[in-house]
A protein has these predicted regions:
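A generic fold-level signal
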Residues: 13-15, 102, 131-134
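Glycine-centered flexibility sites
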Residues: 9, 35, 89, 119, ...
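Hydrophobic face of amphipathic alpha-helices that form TPR/SEL1-like repeat modules
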Residues: 1-25
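Short glycine- and Lys/Arg-enriched binding-loop motifs that mark or flank ligand-binding interfaces
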Residues: 5, 85, 115, 133-136
């Protein structure tokens, strides 16, 4: 199996791939795209292009979409847990009862944060100060992929 990047909703081939190996059996599970700075820049450009439409959606709709992602993960815990166990060597009880369900829970938590982050007013004798939260932009994060 070959796993490509997913940029702008489309699979994108990489210039290089690495093998992911089941640590228990040494079986090659897949060839995974190895990202470059150019790949990150393409993903950031796609995200920037999509950002105005995302930011323009009501917070309740953004929350619904994120909740749906959490539900999708939750419906597939057994399959995702098996894959994670094969990929990382962690026990199936850890991936199936903790790590993968936690990934679903994270989407549910941040979905709720979309609708619960309220601004505050801080009156002073001469001015009205307030906070206002809204989407501000795109960022890229490259981190170890050792848990879902």
């Amino acid at each position: 199996m070959r796993i490509n990047h997913l940029i702008n909703g489309q699979p994108v081939a990489a210039s290089d791939y690495f093998e992911t190996v089941n640590p228990a059996t040494q079986e090659v599970l897949a060839e995974v795209a190895s990202g470059t700075a150019q790949d990150v820049n393409a993903a950031v450009a796609a995200a920037k292009a999509a950002f105005p439409a995302w930011a323009g959606r009501p917070a309740t709709e953004r929350a619904r979409i994120m909740r749906n992602l959490g539900e999708l993960i939750a419906r597939h815990v057994p399959e995702i847990a098996r894959t994670e166990t094969q990929d990382t060597g962690q026990s199936i009880s850890q991936t199936g009862k903790q790590l993968v369900p936690r990934a679903a829970d994270n989407f549910h938590y941040f979905a709720e944060m979309c609708t619960r982050v309220d601004g505050h007013t801080y009156p002073t004798p001469t001015h009205l100060n307030y906070t206002l939260f809204h989407p501000v932009g795109v960022c890229a994060l490259i981190s170890p992929w050792n848990v879902p």
